[in-house]
């Protein structure tokens, strides 16, 4: 345990000195991309990966920032006679280097999957005990990202040290290849990953698997909202369940290492538009990776416009990299069909002195919500200048793309693509530094010194705002 504390302390010292704590120089902002699992599970093929990559480029999503195309489980054909991983040639007839080349030709990055166990979660060969050989396989095929799961781990868990050592073996092996490979742990938050993840990885899952439900309880996700040290993470965890578990963990994330709340369910299942906006907004607020889980070939216009909302993405990609904090949480009487209902207020600092705030309405009706500057700057002492200043308030969803424009883009109208923010020409960091109006939403008013912001938030919805000093 001492070694873990030392590693954590080292990361904190590096942060204090202004040195990136990223163990491999990657992940200075949360990763963005696409993963097949939420929609396609094991139904993966070369055609799916290449077609998705083409579609991401055609729609302008690559330029918005979604640059990783990640192949999940079920790609493997086993191991060769010398123990090397081989792809299933029925699914990937040209091999993995062919896929990587196609993606790289489009300036996209290629992600693959394995598990820190004897088998992957779907029963294919895992990498436990094969870390060096498998890392060489990934590097040889020019993989840029590894999602590393937790199934069939032979009982090598139960303490932070046990899990740390098991995942460190692949971290070391990836580094030994000499190829920069983003390392994404998927150990479901087991053994307090948020304490030690940043020493060996760029992101780490902090809960059981997500499902496309806003706040539905499920016995397969047995740990409650506040059980951040969950002994049995399970799966089918709702959006609110995961968000509430993540609330205390923001203090352990920073550039180079992020809490991963799992893939986005925008465009998956039957979430309402307000639920999809709330889901996307809160993942951005807590600096979770933004990984599309939907079929990009069959996105509805409203979901596409959420994925393309650059003022919200700019919060997620803010170079300061400080996750927002949940300031308060209150239960409400207007519960849904599952007896669930709560409201929350979140706030966090941004690189340029701005502040981002979110009013989250988990209740079953539209409601007024409000917060004062003492809520927004909850750590400030009485008399602090931020409490005695005037702040301009910008609604980060006010300039959302119209469905008609989104439909034009989805139907191949390239001229409409020019309406999307292009982070390949100007990064979010550069755009924020240059006060690019496309990243700030629309001003809706001001908060005077000592004043309050009053908003109306739909059921299962969010009000998301950026505050700028007047």
From Swiss-Prot:
One of its GO terms (cellular component) is extracellular region. GO terms for molecular function: alpha-galactosidase activity. Disulfide bonds join 42-74, 121-151, 221-237, 223-230. Its EC number is 3.2.1.22. Glycans are attached at residues 43, 82, 175, 270, 388, 413, 422, 435, 454. InterPro entries: Aldolase_TIM, Glyco_hydro_27, Glyco_hydro_27/36_CS, Glyco_hydro_b, Glyco_hydro_melibiase, Glycoside_hydrolase_SF, Melibiase_C. It catalyses: Hydrolysis of terminal, non-reducing alpha-D-galactose residues in alpha-D-galactosides, including galactose oligosaccharides, galactomannans and galactolipids. Pfam families: Melibiase_2, Melibiase_C. Substrate binds at residues 72-73, 147, 205, 251. The keyword Secreted applies. It is found in: Secreted. GO terms for biological process: melibiose catabolic process. The keyword Signal applies. Keywords: Disulfide bond, Glycoprotein, Glycosidase, Hydrolase, Secreted, Signal. Residues 1-18 form the signal peptide. The active site is at residues 149, 209. Homotetramer. Belongs to the glycosyl hydrolase 27 family. PANTHER family: ALPHA-GALACTOSIDASE MEL1, ALPHA-GALACTOSIDASE/ALPHA-N-ACETYLGALACTOSAMINIDASE. This is Alpha-galactosidase. The gene is MEL.
């Amino acid at each position: 345990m001492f070694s873990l504390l030392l590693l954590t302390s080292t990361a904190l010292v590096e942060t204090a000195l202004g040195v990136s704590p990223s163990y491999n120089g990657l992940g200075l902002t949360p990763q963005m991309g696409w993963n097949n699992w939420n929609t396609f599970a094991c139904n993966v093929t070369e055609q799916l990966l290449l077609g998705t990559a083409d579609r991401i480029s055609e729609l302008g999503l690559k330029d918005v920032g979604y640059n990783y195309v990640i192949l999940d489980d079920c790609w493997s054909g086993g191991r060769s006679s010398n123990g090397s991983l081989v792809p299933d040639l029925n699914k990937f007839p040209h091999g993995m280097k062919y896929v990587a080349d196609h993606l790289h030709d489009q300036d996209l990055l290629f992600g693959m999957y394995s598990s820190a166990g004897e088998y992957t979660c779907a029963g294919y060969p895992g990498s436990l005990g094969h870390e060096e050989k498998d890392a060489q396989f990934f590097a040889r095929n020019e993989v840029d990202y590894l999602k590393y799961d937790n199934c069939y781990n032979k009982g090598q868990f139960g303490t932070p040290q046990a899990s740390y050592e098991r995942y460190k073996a692949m971290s070391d092996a990836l580094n030994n290849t000499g190829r920069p490979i983003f390392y994404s742990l998927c150990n479901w938050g087991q053994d307090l990953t948020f304490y030690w993840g940043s020493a060996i990885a760029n992101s780490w899952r902090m809960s059981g698997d997500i499902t496309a439900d806003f706040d539905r309880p499920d016995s397969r996700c047995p740990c409650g909202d506040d059980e951040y040290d969950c002994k049995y993470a399970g799966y089918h965890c709702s959006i609110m369940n995961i968000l509430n578990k993540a609330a205390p963990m923001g203090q352990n994330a920073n550039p180079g290492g992020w809490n991963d709340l799992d893939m986005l369910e925008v465009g998956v299942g039957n979430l309402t538009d307000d639920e999809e906006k709330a889901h996307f907004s809160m993942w951005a607020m807590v600096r979770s990776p933004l990984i599309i889980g939907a079929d990009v070939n069959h996105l509805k216009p409203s979901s596409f416009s959420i994925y393309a909302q650059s003022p919200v993405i700019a919060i997620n990609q803010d170079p300061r990299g400080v996750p927002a904090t949940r300031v308060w949480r209150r239960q409400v009487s207007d519960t849904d069909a599952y007896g669930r209902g709560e409201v929350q207020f979140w706030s966090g600092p941004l690189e340029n002195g701005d502040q981002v705030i979110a009013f989250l309405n988990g209740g079953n009706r539209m409601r007024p919500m409000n917060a004062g500057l003492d809520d927004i700057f909850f750590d400030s002492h009485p008399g602090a200048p931020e409490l005695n200043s005037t702040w301009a308030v910008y609604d980060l969803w006010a300039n959302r793309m119209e469905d008609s424009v989104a439909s034009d883009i989805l139907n191949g109208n390239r001229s409409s693509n020019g309406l999307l923010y292009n982070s390949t020409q100007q990064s979010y960091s550069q755009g924020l530094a240059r006060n690019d109006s496309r990243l700030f939403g629309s001003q809706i008013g001001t908060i005077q010194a000592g004043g309050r912001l009053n908003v109306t938030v739909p059921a299962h919805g969010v009000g998301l705002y950026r505050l700028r000093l007047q």
